[in-house]
Swiss-Prot record:
Keyword Cell inner membrane: yes
Transmembrane domains' residue ranges: 9-29, 49-69, 103-123, 137-157, 165-185, 213-233, 247-267, 276-296, 337-357, 363-383, 396-416, 419-439
Location(s), subcellular: Cell inner membrane
Membership in a protein family: Belongs to the HAK/KUP transporter (TC 2.A.72) family.
Gene (UniProt): kup
Protein topology in the membrane: Multi-pass membrane protein
GO molecular function, one term: symporter activity
Predominant cellular place of this UniProt entry's protein: membrane
Classification lineage: Bacteria, Pseudomonadati, Pseudomonadota, Gammaproteobacteria, Enterobacterales
Protein name per Swiss-Prot or TrEMBL: Low affinity potassium transport system protein Kup
Gene Ontology CC, one term: plasma membrane
Catalytic activity, reaction form: K(+)(in) + H(+)(in) = K(+)(out) + H(+)(out)
Keywords: Cell inner membrane, Cell membrane, Ion transport, Membrane, Potassium, Potassium transport, Symport, Transmembrane, Transmembrane helix, Transport
Pfam families per UniProt: K_trans, K_trans_C
Length: 622
């Protein structure tokens, strides 16, 4: 979606409802059921129902309304949000050592997202399909196969883009939230006593009465706020105000009414705990509700998949993941992308999770650790931005951080109890992604430093070539260079082996700035280094895709005429070998070699015609 000025506020707000709130909007399917299912040692008791409802409501108020919508969303990079954006903002005005710590926090947060994203589609779709147990109990054996079929279709359509079906997301999700509100209100009217749980003292009473068990039960309460990171991550698509407006006018009232409606039902009929959401509906509405619930969970899953694609692109462009094929599925919207490798790896992981856990209640045990871990990191990073970038009073910032952590840390600690019952899954996946990202970044830096150790001066080499030129051949040669003031390896090897040089030489560097977009005015910088040498530096934001043809067009506008099909592109292709290392660094080196072999080649990254590319190999020890 785009927040084009021509779009009206209601249209953008409706679109935000369709995308941003899919995950948190489907939480009523399973949250209260997991809270009161008996796993914590108490059943459907009045004090327990009131306590859980009070905790859920005030978590929605404090975590979503105050922390994320009011505070965290103030931290934006040209309107964009997300944990990696927060990481880069926090590290702008800090020491090198502090910046390194903040980068590690940001990468852990991003890794947690990868771990949690495998569970979200599985638990959402399964919890909707489990409505079959109410409609037709004899079909309960079909829950797993039907869940896999639905998700298979969802992952298959990713390559075609979601622009067409995406237009339906907003009205479907608006209908979903209105149904949530209607079902809840109907039940509350029948038993208005449940509204007493709006009083936060019921949450306090819950802790005093149930003591240690109540603390462990926070691991189930947190299910009500899963998906809260999407509010911040999708800020660039819709803007702050539409996301806030959607929350306070539609989403929060609907969620509150539905949770309290389920509570009212349970007070009246404790046996409804087997599936309080679907049992809110009259019998005639069960099948339509099952259908709309399935659609809502598919939309929630789609939002998560799109989020993975966006995070992966950002990590690739910032140098934390190896280059991979990224396909744009819309000519109008740069945010609509498809990454085949990520799509099918995620699909395989989701199917394995569904087959292994078999029921959404089992998956709920795996849910929450990564979410609450990311919440802790977001609190630290966002308050760092408030102190270092906004220059807020340090004591005021400290109070904000303490308030956030007083909620985040108990939630995270309570979820650690899930570690053996399924919480190991997102943590394991997150750990793998953290190792991959830190390995690629550190080993890539080591490789570039090794390649540039020759220490030859670019200016001195150009002066020498102009003074005593080798044989010059007609045409233009472009040498891709990762660093601005370093002699490209391909140039040195071409002179060493071929002993010729083109009449015109362009040293081209494509760099990614710490911003989502770069204005066209700043896209290309051209510097003539000598009569036959030019340096071209093209800058892109991490939401943009570098394109050499566009760079040539910009060069032509500034007086350096280049024609793609009359230009030879020289690139170096490194053959890497591992030097002597300790065993743990050797393992990391082998992982890097694997990533390097499977990385997208530079000509494919920058859309250079293959018949214009000349690759010169070189062996480098790292």
């Amino acid at each position: 979606m785009s927040t084009d000025n021509k779009q009206s506020l209601p249209a953008i707000t409706l679109a935000a409802i369709g995308v941003v709130y899919g995950d948190i909007g489907t939480s009523p399917l399973y949250t209260l059921r997991e809270c009161l299912s008996g796993q914590f040692g108490f059943g459907v008791e009045r004090d327990a129902v009131f306590g859980f409802l009070s905790l859920i409501f005030w978590l929605l108020i404090f975590v979503v309304s105050i922390k994320y919508l009011t505070f965290v969303m103030r931290a934006d990079n040209a309107g964009e949000g997300g944990i990696l954006t927060l990481m880069s903002l926090a590290g702008r005005n800090t020491s090198a050592r502090t910046t390194s710590m903040l980068v590690i926090m940001g990468l852990i947060g991003g890794s947690f997202f990868y771990g949690e994203v495998v569970i979200t589609p599985a638990i959402s779709v399964m919890s909707a399909i489990e409505g079959l147990e109410i409609v037709a109990p004899q079909l309960d054996t079909w829950i797993v196969p039907l869940s896999i079929i639905v998700l298979t279709l969802l992952f298959m359509i990713q390559k075609h883009g979601t622009a067409m079906v995406g237009q339906l997301f907003a009205p479907i999700m608006l209908t979903w939230f209105l149904i949530l509100a209607g079902l809840g209100l109907r039940s509350i009217i029948a038993n208005p006593e449940v509204l007493h749980a709006l009083n936060p003292m019921w949450a306090v009473h819950f802790f005093l009465e149930y003591k240690t068990v109540s603390f462990i039960a926070l691991g189930a309460v947190v299910l009500s706020i899963t998906g809260v990171e999407a509010l911040y991550a999708d800020m660039g698509h819709f803007g702050k105000f539409p996301i806030r407006l959607a929350w306070f006018t539609v989403v929060l009232p609907s969620l509150t009414l539905n949770y309290f409606g389920q509570g009212a039902l349970l007070l009246k009929n404790p046996e409804a705990i087997k599936n309080p959401f679907f049992l809110l509906a009259p019998d005639w509405a069960l099948i339509p509700l099952l259908i709309i619930a399935a659609l809502a969970t598919v939309i929630a899953s789609q939002a998560v998949i799109s989020g993975v694609f966006s995070l992966t692109r950002q990590a690739v462009r910032l140098g934390y993941l190896s280059p991979m094929r990224i396909i744009h599925t819309s000519e109008m919207e740069s945010g609509q992308i498809y990454i085949p490798f990520v799509n099918w790896m995620l699909y395989v992981a989701v199917v394995i999770v569904i087959v292994s856990f078999e029921h959404s209640s089992n998956l709920a045990a795996a849910y929450g650790i990564a979410v609450t871990g990311t919440m802790v990191l977001t609190s630290i990073l966002s308050t760092t931005v408030a102190r270092q970038n906004w220059h807020w009073n340090k004591y005021f910032v400290a109070l904000i951080l303490i308030a956030f952590l007083c909620v985040d840390i108990p939630l995270f600690t309570a979820n650690l109890d899930k570690l053996l019952s399924g919480g190991w899954l997102p943590l394991s996946l997150g750990t793998v992604m953290f190792i991959v990202m830190t390995t690629w970044k550190s080993e890539r830096f080591r490789l570039l430093r090794r390649m540039h150790e020759h220490g030859n001066s670019l200016e001195a080499m150009i002066a020498s070539l102009e003074k005593s030129p080798p044989v010059r051949v007609p045409g233009t040669a472009v040498y891709m260079s990762r660093a601005i003031n370093v002699i490209p390896f391909a140039l040195m090897h071409n002179l060493k082996h071929n002993k010729v040089l083109h009449e015109r030489v362009i040293l081209l560097t494509l760099r990614t700035e710490d911003a989502p977009y770069v204005h066209n005015v700043r896209r290309v910088q051209i510097e003539q280094l000598s009569p036959t040498f030019w340096r071209v530096v093209a800058s892109y934001g991490w939401r943009e895709t570098p394109n050499v043809e566009e760079v040539f067009h910009r060069c032509g506008l500034e007086g350096l005429s280049c024609r793609m099909m009359e230009t030879s592109f020289f690139m170096s292709h490194e053959s890497l070998i591992l030097g002597k290392r300790p065993w743990y660094l050797r393992l990391r080196g082998k992982l890097y070699l694997l990533l390097q072999r499977n990385a997208l080649r530079a000509p494919d990254q920058f859309e250079i015609p293959p018949n214009r590319v000349i690759e010169l190999g070189t062996q480098v020890e790292i």
